[in-house]
């Protein structure tokens, strides 16, 4: 959520910066509401002062034995007007708050300006895509050969965009997640967490999924109780652990990691990636979250991205890093890097991780603060998140990049300790 001071003092500048994201801010509506809010607030303050004066006069008149009925009537009338003013003021503020919750974050000055993914800027590449001397099979065909990927069984259970994994491929999927968690906790300094997969609306509002992106979520309605939502990412549960907290400066940075399933309706993805595991309603992901001092968040973004890259490097999977343009960044991001892994069957790089600095955008929504030792006062923290990595898409990349001519899959060296001696999946 943006700082309300920005919207009051620099509204047109904010609108211009948001326009670079393709977001049209209704400046006239906000100005109109602000004018009404100020007018009602001024009138209410004046009325309160008059009421206080009348109340004082009642005591004086009573002491003199004068008729206080007219004064009492005035005070009662003013009390009713004050109550009506409060209702009006609350309504205006609720409308302003509703608008603010739909406004995306302001992009950092270092973010390339652009309208779509076509304007993203490649920052670097790592590794060279393998030259195959046989016809490349995609992960669906490879899974059929080994019997380890079954989309028909999943469709029977749940419909489209689900998968059943079995045997060595299921184990490889588990191995990938364990490897990622061990790397991030053992070498990158993250603390592992196990968090709920069901959260309530305030948590999703805190990280920015609600109210704007409810159609992307799976919702569980409960009669007489608060609704649940299945998490679209562990970013929601991990980041909200600091909601409403004031963190001691000595505790920062907080570095949290979790391996969870993620659930997404893919409401806007009709017809896209319908084959295989690239785009699923349910998929596993290892998520990294950092909570840092504001002055250190851009440096932390570079480190977070490097942590995600290290997974791909150790798996020896070719990838590239993109700086997302203003028009392609996520709702809450100040700046984002995407990691894209090489998928041989598609002859292109596909997103496997998104690493974002959200600045104080989420912290303001959650009221997550730290105590600045220089001032002694609570201030908003900065939050960051990144996939480290999406497990299903990493499995796709491993299957395709490590395939052999007969359809078997070599197990990457770093995963062999997790595979119980299995070196080739047939």
From Swiss-Prot:
Keyword Transferase: no
Binding sites annotated in the UniProt record for L-serine: 233-235, 287, 387
Name listed for the protein in its UniProt record: Serine--tRNA ligase
Listed PANTHER family: SERINE--TRNA LIGASE, SERYL-TRNA SYNTHETASE
Domain description: Consists of two distinct domains, a catalytic core and a N-terminal extension that is involved in tRNA binding.
Pfam families recorded: Seryl_tRNA_N (PF02403), tRNA-synt_2b (PF00587)
Pathway noted in the entry: Aminoacyl-tRNA biosynthesis; selenocysteinyl-tRNA(Sec) biosynthesis; L-seryl-tRNA(Sec) from L-serine and tRNA(Sec): step 1/1
GO MF entry, a single one: serine-tRNA ligase activity
A GO CC annotation given for this chain: cytoplasm
Reactions the enzyme catalyzes: tRNA(Ser) + L-serine + ATP = L-seryl-tRNA(Ser) + AMP + diphosphate + H(+); tRNA(Sec) + L-serine + ATP = L-seryl-tRNA(Sec) + AMP + diphosphate + H(+)
Role this protein plays: Catalyzes the attachment of serine to tRNA(Ser). Is also able to aminoacylate tRNA(Sec) with serine, to form the misacylated tRNA L-seryl-tRNA(Sec), which will be further converted into selenocysteinyl-tRNA(Sec).
Subcellular location: Cytoplasm
Keywords: Aminoacyl-tRNA synthetase, ATP-binding, Cytoplasm, Ligase, Nucleotide-binding, Protein biosynthesis
Domain of life: Bacteria
E.C. designation(s): 6.1.1.11
GO biological process: selenocysteine biosynthetic process; seryl-tRNA aminoacylation
